[in-house]
Every structure is written in structure tokens, then in C-alpha cells.
Regions:
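Bacterial Sec-dependent N-terminal signal peptides
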Residues: 1-11
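Acidic/histidine-rich, surface-exposed loop or edge segments in extracytoplasmic proteins
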Residues: 10-22, 92-104
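N-terminal targeting signals for Sec/Tat export/insertion, comprising classic cleavable signal peptides
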Residues: 16-51
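Short, contiguous alpha-helical
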Residues: 27, 35-38, 52-100, 139-180
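Surface-exposed helix-capping loop/turn segments at secondary-structure junctions
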Residues: 42-51, 126-135, 170-177
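Acidic/histidine-rich alpha-helical segments that form the ligand environment
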Residues: 104-137, 149-161
Length: 180
């Protein structure tokens, strides 16, 4: 069975050949990522937020090292911080929250609220992207120098961590929402 993410049913119907504004295009991507990310964050039971894979999780024939692997909660904290960071670059302003305050959150409730707030801030940033400024260079990050590219990277970066979180769910016997 396929979920909304696999079928594309989360996006509104558009007429092929219709011109979209940069913000509409970016919002489409961010909305899908937000829905999927928040879905996996909500799906993990609160008592499993401290879960991280270890060598003991796998067969003895595997020799991978797991030092420094983030817990499920730390994955949420990382993406939340990144959302604020990348969105602040689009807006050309200082991050409105201290990253250390996000990293200190430990409960599911706190982390879900922080993540939701970071997505709201990202939507605020995307709302400032216009046809005129989408590809004007900004003080970007890691070689990303336009609002449009940084906006796309919010989702691209987040999906990397979303994929890890999906595996954490499965390791704990939880079917990810996108697979239902």
C-alpha cells in the first residue's frame, strides 16, 4: 500500500503549463516535507525518543561504529535548528532562537512544538521569495547562494534526516505514516 508521499496526493491539483511563483513552488516542497517529518516525529512513542542504533542492534558480522549517532530526539532537534538556520539566511537576519535552547529539549511535546515553530519560521522566510529576488545572491551557506536554492535545501537536508528517522521507527516496530 502506498501513502500520500508516494502518490503525490498531498499537493493541490494544478493545470499543466501553469506558471507558478517561486514561493508557490517552494511552499509545495516545504509543505510535503513538513507533513512527512511531523508525521514520523509524532509516530514515535515518547519513551523511544532516546533511541539510537548501536552495534548491538545489528548482527555481529557488521563492524560499523555507532559512536555519535543521534538519538531520535536529537534528529528532531537537528532538523529544527537547521530549519531556523536556513530560513534566517533567506531572510538575512539572525536566528530568532538560540540553537542551544533547542538542543536542550528532551520531551516529545517540547520537540514537536519546537519543530512546528521552526516550520512556521521557514514558511515566513519562503513567503519573502519573489520572482525578482529568488535568484539574487545572498549571504548563503555551504556554497548555496540564492534564496531559492537555500529554500530547496531546507527540504533536501531535512529529508536525509527524515530517512534516518523512518528507520528508527521501523527498528522500534512502528510503521512510518508514509507507508500506511
Amino acid at each position: 500500500m502506498t501513502g500520500p508521499a508516494q502518490t503525490g496526493s498531498t499537493s493541490a491539483k494544478v493545470t499543466v503549463g501553469t506558471q507558478m511563483s517561486p514561493v508557490q513552488a517552494q511552499e509545495e516542497l516545504l509543505n510535503l516535507f513538513e507533513q512527512e517529518f511531523m508525521g514520523v516525529a509524532q509516530a514515535m512513542p515518547a519513551d523511544k525518543y532516546g533511541f539510537a542504533p548501536t552495534a548491538a542492534t545489528f548482527t555481529t558480522a557488521q563492524s560499523a561504529k555507532y559512536d555519535g549517532v543521534r538519538t531520535f530526539a536529537q534528529e528532531i532537534s537537528h532538523v529544527t535548528t537547521a530549519n531556523y538556520y536556513f530560513a534566517s539566511k533567506i531572510l538575512g537576519e539572525k536566528m530568532p532562537v538560540d540553537p542551544k535552547s533547542i538542543q536542550s529539549l528532551t520531551t516529545k511535546e517540547e520537540l514537536l512544538k519546537a519543530a512546528a515553530d521552526s516550520f512556521a519560521y521557514a514558511h515566513k522566510a519562503l513567503a519573502t521569495i519573489t520572482a525578482e529576488n529568488a535568484y539574487t545572491t545572498i549571504d548563503g551557506v555551504d556554497g548555496l547562494h540564492t534564496r531559492s536554492v537555500v529554500a530547496s535545501f531546507i527540504s533536501a537536508h531535512g529529508y536525509d534526516h527524515y530517512g534516518q528517522m523512518v528507520e528508527y521507527l521501523r527498528m522500534n516496530g512502528v510503521v512510518p505514516p508514509g507507508s500506511k
